[in-house]
């Protein structure tokens, strides 16, 4: 039986390096130790919240597995390895271990583009979209995302009685995902056990169709979490509202929507 003595978080760890880990200048926070280098990229609070291994407690392989799972959910973390080393015995003769949680940083930002063409019975069109992501916007592995999309399609044939001779769409969405359960008055232990993420988002969409012109505004507050070691996934929409406005429309269009 082994009890945990010191727990070190080693940021910017290089798996190919063979040098010994220098812990002489490690910082401390809530009885944990941090080897951060010159530019720490993630808050100490976030690291401690996702660690199930605690100083002074009995070694548990389940705590190790839960810690791996928790750090695997942090999108700014590319690589995690947990290493243990014997640390002798304390004054009561109890065997002790030191723990090293070795982390490597992933790329914080990404941009993706999409382009597509359409042909609907001879009516040609195209759509273009772009997505930007920052995986560590507040240095707690929060993911900020911004999406824009535009589409256009020409229309042919008899357009009498319609208000638009084309189909156009322009929309955007911004959101932030926190890798923890955010709600007032919750204990840290409960948040840690939930393995949940919290999503906030707002969106705006403008559409021109032959029968109407429509503007949609929306906002959402959602929770996502897993149970039974990730076998079950759950979604809960605490808030999901949409406001629809039709500045122009043909007669009778509302009855057909």
Question: How should each PLM-predicted stretch be described?
Answer:
Residues 35-42, 52, 110, 162-257:
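Transmembrane beta-strand segments of outer-membrane beta-barrel domains in Gram-negative
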Residues 51, 84, 109-119, 128-130, ...:
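Transmembrane beta-strand segments that form the barrel wall of outer-membrane beta-barrel proteins
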Residues 41, 58-65, 74, 122-126, ...:
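Conserved structured core elements
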Residues 73-78, 103-109, 134-143, 183-184, ...:
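Secondary-structure transition/capping motifs at alpha-helix termini
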Residues 58-73, 81-84, 88, 148-186:
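Amphipathic, soluble alpha/beta structural segments
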Residues 11-13, 105-107, 117-119, 132-136, ...:
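Beta-strand elements of well-folded, non-transmembrane domains
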Residues 1-119, 149:
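Periplasmic polypeptide-binding modules associated with outer-membrane biogenesis and secretion
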Residues 48, 66, 94-98, 110-112, ...:
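Transmembrane beta-barrel architecture of outer membranes
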